[in-house]
């Protein structure tokens, strides 16, 4: 009996205005939804099965709301997919759970203190899901009557609206008439009116009026006439972050700062009042706290004061999940003379869970480069892909990935349809990888300005090869022919 073939379908969403970035091909963690077992290559991620499964377990706990105030460190050598793993988690969480990405060097600013920048990042990563009930009227417009006064008084009108079960007539004031005119509401339209705010939403047009016109616009949407009562109670859910509430309450017309980005320092008293109010909403059942994710890339760039602040912030009631990435080994903690694993203090390492990533195999490199070529819409020959895989194994995945675009430009110059080996070879000769660049620096050491300011301006280093001019002694120059 033949084994059953299981296929996994993946839809590729339209990118829109987003440019092709280093991780734009990642659309999730690529794990099975039920067993959390990672697939070999799925949703843009390849290999790193153990790390992806560990990330999937953390992700499942985040979705269930069972984990908050925890820290996870993704540690591994460069070009092993640490940031890609975090991006996969962000894509899997969706838009409802706040996900904030922060590079460790971003917190150093002259306009804002380090702790304020970290506080804002923490507050951006905590969502508040606010529930409110609104009374709406939804139905098909039968007739609109507008009476304009000759003497210039306010306009008055009547709106006849119906469902399949009932019909009613409402009096309209001048503001409602203006709103109807602005939305271009006419007989046959299906509309929704929020009674508390007076907002009118045009949902579509009734099927009964589909023959009124011979030609319709592409945005015309035909709907069935609503049934039941005209007036209904509807629960509306808004998800905002604590940082957005902070900004709005920090100054007059604070909501404008949300768009300009000029938030500045926010006083701790305002944050305390907001925390108290959110706690009241939570007790009354009006709001729900959504712990999000704060991702700090290159976390070893933080100094000892920042780690001390994060230690305290993780113990507070309103704390997100902090995911960090580091490619350092046993290195010095910034701001101290002490060395520690991953460049993090030992008391901070004691609080975190660590996920390790390993170097990719040649087969995994080939699959990643294939995905990148598809994302950048580059057609590679099998030999060119094999050469790029070899380059990636020896010079690094990032360098090989960058060669895809440059090889495509060289290929387009000779008006070929497929990127061949000669295109990759020419691109390899034009652009140096780190190893060849280091070799060039070593060979040209005397021609380059060193840390002591010594440089040789003579062609080929002269006869003796010794420096002829120095930064300190400008008068010592060899003028012999």
Swiss-Prot record:
Annotated residues for binding of ATP: 76-83
Xref: SMART domains: AAA
GO MF annotations in UniProt: 3'-5' DNA helicase activity; 5'-3' DNA helicase activity; ATP binding; ATP hydrolysis activity; DNA helicase activity
InterPro entries: AAA+_ATPase, P-loop_NTPase, RuvB-like, RuvB-like_C, RuvBL1/2_DNA/RNA_bd_dom, TIP49_P-loop
Highest taxon listed in the record's lineage: Eukaryota
Keywords: Activator, ATP-binding, Chromatin regulator, DNA damage, DNA repair, Helicase, Hydrolase, Nucleotide-binding, Nucleus, rRNA processing, Transcription, Transcription regulation
Catalytic activity: ATP + H2O = ADP + phosphate + H(+)
GO annotations of cellular component type: Ino80 complex; NuA4 histone acetyltransferase complex; R2TP complex; Swr1 complex
GO BP: box C/D snoRNP assembly; chromatin remodeling; DNA repair; regulation of transcription by RNA polymerase II; rRNA processing
EC number: 3.6.4.12
Subcellular location: Nucleus
Similarity section: Belongs to the RuvB family.
Function, in words: DNA helicase which participates in several chromatin remodeling complexes, including the SWR1 and the INO80 complexes. The SWR1 complex mediates the ATP-dependent exchange of histone H2A for the H2A variant H2A.Z leading to transcriptional regulation of selected genes by chromatin remodeling. The INO80 complex remodels chromatin by shifting nucleosomes and is involved in DNA repair. Also involved in pre-rRNA processing.
Self-association state and partner proteins as the record states: May form heterododecamers with hel-1/rvb1. Component of the SWR1 chromatin remodeling complex, the INO80 chromatin remodeling complex, and of the R2TP complex.
Name of this protein: RuvB-like helicase 2
Organism name: Neurospora crassa (strain ATCC 24698 / 74-OR23-1A / CBS 708.71 / DSM 1257 / FGSC 987)
């Amino acid at each position: 009996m033949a084994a059953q073939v299981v296929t996994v379908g993946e839809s590729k969403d339209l990118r829109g205005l987003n440019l092709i970035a280093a991780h734009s091909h990642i659309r999730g963690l690529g794990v099975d939804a039920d067993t959390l077992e990672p697939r070999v290559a799925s949703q843009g991620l390849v290999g790193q099965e153990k790390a992806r499964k560990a990330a999937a377990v953390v992700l499942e706990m985040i979705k269930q709301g069972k984990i908050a105030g925890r820290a996870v460190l993704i540690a591994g050598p460069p070009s092993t997919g640490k940031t890609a793993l975090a991006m996969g988690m962000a894509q899997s969480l969706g838009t409802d759970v706040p996900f904030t990405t922060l590079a460790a060097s971003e917190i150093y600013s002259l306009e804002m203190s380090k702790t304020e920048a970290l506080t804002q990042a923490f507050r951006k990563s905590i969502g508040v899901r606010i529930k409110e009930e609104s009374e709406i009227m939804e139905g098909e417009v039968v007739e609109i009557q507008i009476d304009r006064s000759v003497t210039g008084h306010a306009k008055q009108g009547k709106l006849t609206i119906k469902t399949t079960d009932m019909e009613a007539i409402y009096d309209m004031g001048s503001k409602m008439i203006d709103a109807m005119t602005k939305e271009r509401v006419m007989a046959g339209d299906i509309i929704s009116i929020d009674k508390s705010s007076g907002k009118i939403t045009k949902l579509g047009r009734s099927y009964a009026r589909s023959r009124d016109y011979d030609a319709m616009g592409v945005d015309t949407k035909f709907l069935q006439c609503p049934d039941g009562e005209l007036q209904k109670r509807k629960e509306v859910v808004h998800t905002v972050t604590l940082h957005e509430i902070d900004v709005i309450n920090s100054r007059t017309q604070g909501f404008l700062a949300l768009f300009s980005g000029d938030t500045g320092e926010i006083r701790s008293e305002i944050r305390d009042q907001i925390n108290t109010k959110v706690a009241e909403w939570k007790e009354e059942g009006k709001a729900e706290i959504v712990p999000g994710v704060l991702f700090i890339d290159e976390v070893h760039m933080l100094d000892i004061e920042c780690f001390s602040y994060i230690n305290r912030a993780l113990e507070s009631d309103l704390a997100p999940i902090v995911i960090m990435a580091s490619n350092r080994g046993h290195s010095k903690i910034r701001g101290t003379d002490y060395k520690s694993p991953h460049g993090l203090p030992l008391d901070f390492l004691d609080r975190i869970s660590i996920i390790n990533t390993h170097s990719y195999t040649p087969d995994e490199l080939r699959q990643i480069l294939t995905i990148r070529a598809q994302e950048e819409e580059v057609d590679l020959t099998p030999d060119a892909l094999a050469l790029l895989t070899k380059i990636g194994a020896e010079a690094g995945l990032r360098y090989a990935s960058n060669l895809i675009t440059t090889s495509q430009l060289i290929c387009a110059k000779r008006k070929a349809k497929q990127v061949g080996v000669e295109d990759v070879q020419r691109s390899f000769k034009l652009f140096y990888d780190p190893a060849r660049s280091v070799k060039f620096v070593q060979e040209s050491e005397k021609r380059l300005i060193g840390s002591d300011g010594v440089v040789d301006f003579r062609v080929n280093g002269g006869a003796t090869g010794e420096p002829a001019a120095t930064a300190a002694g400008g008068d010592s120059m060899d003028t012999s022919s």
